[in-house]
């Protein structure tokens, strides 16, 4: 018997933002981004929409920056200290999912940035979610070359989800 597991995307929208954010919208954006990046179909991902205070606390605790930010990504896969990788045909339990991590987005920050950029809050939320998911998939922007690669993937993903935004 072959078991197929579908991507599981868990979403928490904190109470002040429940009427402002569609969990279904976030799920579609994350799902399309993961598919476009050929992520493991058994992947799991968590998304949290929160406020400025909570994201500021997390930013301070984990990045030592005492200020709010728009999005934080928490990578959950453990780094392998011996740099070992299992062969492609290595057996894994059929129901064992790969938990990529958590993407935390500040709704108020997204709202501010959307206003400054002249587009909708949903457009900004989609961009931030794509950005966060790409971080979980290993993309980064600390060096110029890596930043160009990540920006290219963000642009492709934004074009891919254009229909969802309309």
From Swiss-Prot:
Keywords: Cytoplasm, Endonuclease, Hydrolase, Metal-binding, Nuclease, Ribosome biogenesis, rRNA processing, Zinc. NCBIfam families: rRNA maturation RNase YbeY. It is an enzyme of class 3 (hydrolase). One of its GO terms (cellular component) is cytoplasm. It holds the Pfam family YbeY. The lineage of its organism: Bacteria, Bacillati, Chloroflexota, Dehalococcoidia, Dehalococcoidales. This is Endoribonuclease YbeY. Its EC number is 3.1.-.-. Single strand-specific metallo-endoribonuclease involved in late-stage 70S ribosome quality control and in maturation of the 3' terminus of the 16S rRNA. Gene3D superfamilies: Metalloproteases ('zincins'), catalytic domain (3.40.390.30). The keyword Transcription does not apply. Binds 1 zinc ion. Its cofactor is Zn(2+). Belongs to the endoribonuclease YbeY family. GO terms for biological process: rRNA processing. One of its GO terms (molecular function) is RNA endonuclease activity.
């Amino acid at each position: 018997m072959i078991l197929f597991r579908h991507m599981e995307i868990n979403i928490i929208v904190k109470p002040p933002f429940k009427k402002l954010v569609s969990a279904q919208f976030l799920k579609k954006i994350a799902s399309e981004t993961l598919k476009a990046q050929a992520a493991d179909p058994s992947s799991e991902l968590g998304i949290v929409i929160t406020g400025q205070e909570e994201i500021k606390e997390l930013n301070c605790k984990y990045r030592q920056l005492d200020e709010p930010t728009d999005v934080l990504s928490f990578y959950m896969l453990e780094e392998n200290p011996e740099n070992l990788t299992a062969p492609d045909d290595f057996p894994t339990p059929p129901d064992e999912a790969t938990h990529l991590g958590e993407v935390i987005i500040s709704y108020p920050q997204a709202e501010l940035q959307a206003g400054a950029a002249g587009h909708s809050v949903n457009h900004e939320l989609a961009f931030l979610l794509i950005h966060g998911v790409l971080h979980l998939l290993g993309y980064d922007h600390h060096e110029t070359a890596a930043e160009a690669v990540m920006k290219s993937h963000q642009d492709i993903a934004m074009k891919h989800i254009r229909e969802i935004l309309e």
